[in-house]
């Protein structure tokens, strides 16, 4: 519970992209990302290593890879526009970076939705120190 309180305090000042990604996931899955995905398995949240533990963790791995390809962008900082139409996420205009970041986030949100059935509560708050296998290539 203390961790949730700390995260809430830290996120009060968060604006832009990371908050947008949170909203996108919440709209797609109906789940609160801060408690559902932030500390999930080996790749969800900051950093990642080892072999993804399941399909949900693989969504995070692929998302990290997607961000990794955007070398000229600031995926965690750039603000983009998107809307939801008939349950579809539609990335809006903006710069090429903003569009690409939005598409990475959209793919992750859809992946989480498609893999809700694989979500394993045992991987929530999983210690990254247990992720010791060699990481797959993107």
Curated annotation (Swiss-Prot):
It comes from the Eukaryota. Keywords: Calcium, Disulfide bond, Hemostasis impairing toxin, Hydrolase, Lipid degradation, Lipid metabolism, Metal-binding, Platelet aggregation inhibiting toxin, Secreted, Signal, Toxin. Ca(2+) binds at residues 43, 45, 47, 64. SUPFAM superfamilies: Phospholipase A2, PLA2. Its cofactor is Ca(2+). It is found in: Secreted. Residues 1-16 form the signal peptide. The active site is at residues 63, 105. One of its GO terms (biological process) is arachidonate secretion. It is an enzyme of class 3 (hydrolase). Monomer. Belongs to the phospholipase A2 family. Group II subfamily. D49 sub-subfamily. PANTHER family: PHOSPHOLIPASE A2 FAMILY MEMBER, PHOSPHOLIPASE A2, MEMBRANE ASSOCIATED. This is Acidic phospholipase A2 jerdoxin.
